[in-house]
Amino acid sequence: MAFLFAILTAFILYPVLRVLWIALSDETGNLTLIHFLNFFRRPLFREALWNTLVSGLLVVVFSGLLSLPLAYIIARYEFRGKLLLQTAATLPLVIPPFVGAVALQLILGRSGMINLLLMRWFDTTVPFMEGLAGVVLVQTLHFFPFILLNTVVSLSNIDPSMEEMAQNMGCHGFRLFRRITLPLMLPGFVAGSLLTFIRAIDDLGTPLMLNYKNLLAPQAYLRITTVGMDDVDGYVVCVALVFLSLVSLLAARKYLGLAEYATVQRSAPVTRRLQGNKVFLVWLLCGALLGVSLLPHIGILLLSFSKVWSFTLLPTTYTLGNFAEILFRAPHFIKNTLLYTLLAAGLDIILGAAIAFLLLRSRLAGRNLLDAIATLPLAIPGVVLAVGYLRVFHGWDFPGLGAPLTSSWVILVIAYTMRRLPYTVRASYAALQQVHISLEESAQSLGANRLKTFVKITLPMITGGL
């Protein structure tokens, strides 16, 4: 346990505390709030804070509007092609947002496909991808599945008898949804909205790709990379990002604590089978929503096969040379990506399983603190953790490298591991809860030590969850 504490403290807790300390201290090391006063005195930072808050809320609102119809249809109806619909609805999570931004520029940008058509037909253009609107559009199309997936689970867990009783008393249609269904599904909807908000304000690649820098995440990145690591304003911006994340977490928890959402008993979920014209209408609605959400994928697919695509509705020429370039002439891009992600995933599985085992199978003091530190990256924006790594490890030589840790590929693996650790901890915890302790006790009674019991009994049974 001490080893796990040391790892999590070194690579999660200490970098974040280091960022906080620099923002709250002066040149002599004394605590001060002068840096935050200077932050609010500067119009650039005030506008960046306001834009970040507004963009995060707008992404949540538009993601909710896109997700609710899809979630309700998926959770409440059975029809041909439902599995295909569910799969297509989660595809936006496959590509990073900044990749989607590149593709959307070719479809909705100033000289993109849609604006070329508008110019041809109506002699006008619409600035879909300009400024904050473009950032909100890209992030909405990428992050809405977080709300969708959580809302589907919440809708499926609602006791059908609650709605049946309301219908027997004359409550139907939208009134039924507003008075009964919506309040009961709020926990899942709020959880998805919270995750969407945090991911939206944390997103660095999309604003930079769209050349919109007046948000907190780009400002933190630019201050540290252009002015330097000694620029206090960059650390203050990072603390402002952390503050927004924590406030959103507390607000969601407070809101959900105002009411009771549990039911005493729950019947099996009831779905209605659609046939005939109703299936066509459902696919018409879902097809329109998913068609918009999959625009980045369509654009990136066309771009990958194009040789030239500029100021035309579609690529003028197509080629497989782009794939040949990546696969045969520059394969190190793919090799490095696979190597780093596989190493990070392997480390996450080891650390996540070990932490979950300590949480469930031990009574050691401090295990709850260990869980809190391991879960911290969910609330800490990635750019804040990256800035903390630069500050802490820039002058620290990694054993065997002979160079600072931040100048080697090792720091990427560590960052990926720590950033995604909460997911493997929670997955391991859930899987381990399904393994009865009597199975481990039986192995130990036959002479196996705890390590052998974990490797031979526990680990194979939780592999599916991992």
Locations of regions flagged by a protein language model:
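Membrane-water interface segments at the C-terminal ends of transmembrane alpha-helices
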Residues: 1-27, 37, 41-156, 182-204, ...
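Short alpha-helical segment that forms part of, or immediately flanks, the ligand-binding pocket
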Residues: 163, 440-441
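Flexible interhelical linker loops that connect adjacent transmembrane helices
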Residues: 255-288
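Alpha-helical residues within the helix-turn-helix
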Residues: 167, 222, 444
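A donor-sugar binding/catalytic signature common to diverse glycosyltransferases
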Residues: 435-439
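Juxtamembrane interface elements at the cytosolic ends of transmembrane helices
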Residues: 162, 216, 247-265, 297
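A short glycine-centered flexible hinge/capping loop motif at secondary-structure junctions
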Residues: 63, 169-171, 446-448
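Glycine-rich helix-loop "coupling/hinge" segments at transmembrane-helix boundaries
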Residues: 25, 106, 204-228, 312-316
